[in-house]
Amino acid sequence: MMTNNDKMLAQFGADWVKVRDYIKSLNMFYISYTPTFMVRIEKETGVPANTVKSILDYGLQIGLYGKTSDRDYITLSPVK
């Protein structure tokens, strides 16, 4: 049975996979949460920056990413 999280990530389809893999390839714990970084991901993956923001926002909402004290950065959350 698909959970709501699975359904939402499925909505992003291949875009989610491209963004996830690109972020993984950076080997960074802190991920920049700025328009500049979202445009950088767009240039590297071809996924529109607005979609990148939606993916990161949803990742924050479901706990894939965590907030930091600096609003310009998010972190990878530990896998539960």
Question: What residue ranges belong to the model's regions?
Answer:
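Short alpha-helical segments that sit at the start of domains
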Residues: 1-23
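Short acidic, hydrophobic short linear motifs in intrinsically disordered regions
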Residues: 29-43
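Short amphipathic alpha-helical interaction segments
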Residues: 46-58
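Minor-groove-contacting beta-hairpin "wing" of winged helix-turn-helix DNA-binding domains
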Residues: 71-78
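A short, conserved structural fragment
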Residues: 60-70
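Short, amphipathic alpha-helical "recognition" segments used to contact nucleic acids or chromatin
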Residues: 21-31
